[in-house]
């Protein structure tokens, strides 16, 4: 039995469940928003492997810290996770992600964890950086709470209460391509790049959740090497790697341990089956 843990349903959840069952394996969904769910000190489930589609993050109205507490409780009961919970946490924390990637030689935007405007200005002065700059919540998801400051006045406004929001300031990587912005999502499953696409938007936030569109991407050997290295140093079995191109260089901005599959399905790439095969492989090992 494989269990998919999620805060809420969605096309990726149900497509993945079907792919697992089509391969002859039982699959259950642990829906953490269910009215029938009771998590007391005796809470446990019967399963051979848990694939969490939850992270710890700032989703506004979604179950986040609660989800994380449930997952950690199940880990304490001896359950096995793909991806590991440590990997999920490290990828949820954008500052931790950037730290790990940069220490392993991957190109990332200059980044600092800030408490207030004074910290933000100190960072800009120390790194000799100019506007614009990006501010984001370290645990933000789906392109939410990502903002651009173009001046001191805007920075002062956007950096207010940063210490209470775990906010980052980050170098702005201008990846505009003509009249649009195009970044890249590459999917790694069990040490293999299985596909990728460009995310296209009229602004610098390209996430599909906030309206970005997709187009096919031919994953070059250089991009493949970057994606595989990201997955390896993050200890990820299933990972979406987000990359910004600029002046012939590639900046890794985020990694995602619960990448959506809808975009790949629209391009005819059956990544649900590949993820299902990965989960079944480690369930049986």
Swiss-Prot record:
Obligatory cofactor(s): Mn(2+)
Occurrences of domain ATP-grasp (ranges): 98-284
An example Gene Ontology biological process: protein modification process
Catalyzed reactions per annotation: oxidized coenzyme F420-2 + L-glutamate + ATP = oxidized coenzyme alpha-F420-3 + ADP + phosphate + H(+)
SUPFAM superfamilies: Glutathione synthetase ATP-binding domain-like
Keywords: ATP-binding, Ligase, Manganese, Metal-binding, Nucleotide-binding
Enzyme Commission no: 6.3.2.32
Entry GO terms, CC: cytoplasm
Pathway it works in: Cofactor biosynthesis; coenzyme F420 biosynthesis
InterPro entries in UniProt: ATP-grasp (IPR011761), ATP-grasp_RimK-type (IPR013651), ATP_grasp_subdomain_1 (IPR013815), F420_CofF (IPR031039), Rp_bS6_RimK/Lys_biosynth_LsyX (IPR004666)
Binding site for Mn(2+) 1: 242, 254
GO MF term set: ATP binding; coenzyme F420-2 alpha-glutamyl ligase activity; metal ion binding
Note on how the cofactor is bound: Binds 2 manganese ions per subunit.
EC main group: ligase
Residues holding Mn(2+) 2: 254, 256
Chain sites annotated for binding ATP: 136, 170-183, 199
Family: Belongs to the RimK family. CofF subfamily.
Function: Catalyzes the ATP-dependent addition of one alpha-linked L-glutamate molecule to coenzyme gamma-F420-2, producing coenzyme alpha-F420-3. Thus, caps the gamma-polyglutamate tail of coenzyme F420 with a terminal alpha-linked glutamate.
Quaternary assembly: Monomer.
The protein, known as: Coenzyme gamma-F420-2:alpha-L-glutamate ligase
Organism: Methanococcus maripaludis (strain DSM 14266 / JCM 13030 / NBRC 101832 / S2 / LL)
């Amino acid at each position: 039995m494989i269990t998919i843990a999620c805060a809420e349903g969605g096309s990726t959840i149900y497509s993945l469940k079907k792919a697992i069952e089509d391969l002859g394996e039982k699959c259950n969904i642990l829906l953490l928003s269910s009215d029938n769910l009771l998590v007391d000190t005796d809470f446990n489930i019967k399963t051979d492997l848990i694939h969490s589609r939850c992270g710890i993050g700032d989703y506004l109205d979604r179950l986040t810290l609660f989800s994380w507490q449930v997952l950690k409780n199940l880990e304490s009961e001896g359950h096995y996770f793909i991806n590991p919970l440590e990997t999920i946490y490290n990828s949820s924390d954008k500052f931790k992600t950037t730290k790990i990637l940069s220490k392993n030689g991957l190109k990332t935007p200059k980044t600092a964890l800030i408490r207030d405007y004074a910290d933000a200005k100190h960072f800009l002065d120390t790194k000799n950086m100019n506007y614009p700059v990006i501010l984001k919540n370290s645990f933000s998801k789906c392109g939410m709470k990502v903002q651009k400051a173009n001046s001191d006045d805007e920075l002062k406004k956007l950096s207010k209460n940063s210490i209470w929001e775990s906010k980052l300031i980050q170098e702005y990587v201008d990846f505009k391509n003509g009249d649009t912005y195009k970044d890249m999502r590459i999917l790694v499953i069990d040490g293999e790049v299985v596909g990728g696409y460009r995310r296209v938007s009229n602004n610098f936030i390209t996430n599909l959740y906030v309206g970005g569109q997709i187009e096919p991407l031919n994953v070059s050997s250089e991009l493949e090497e970057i994606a595989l290295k990201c997955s390896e140093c993050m200890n990820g079995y299933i990972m979406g790697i987000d990359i910004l191109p600029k002046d012939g260089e590639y900046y890794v901005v985020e990694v995602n341990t619960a990448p959506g599959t809808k975009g790949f399905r629209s391009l005819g790439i059956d990544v649900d089956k590949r993820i299902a095969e990965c989960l079944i492989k480690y369930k049986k090992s």
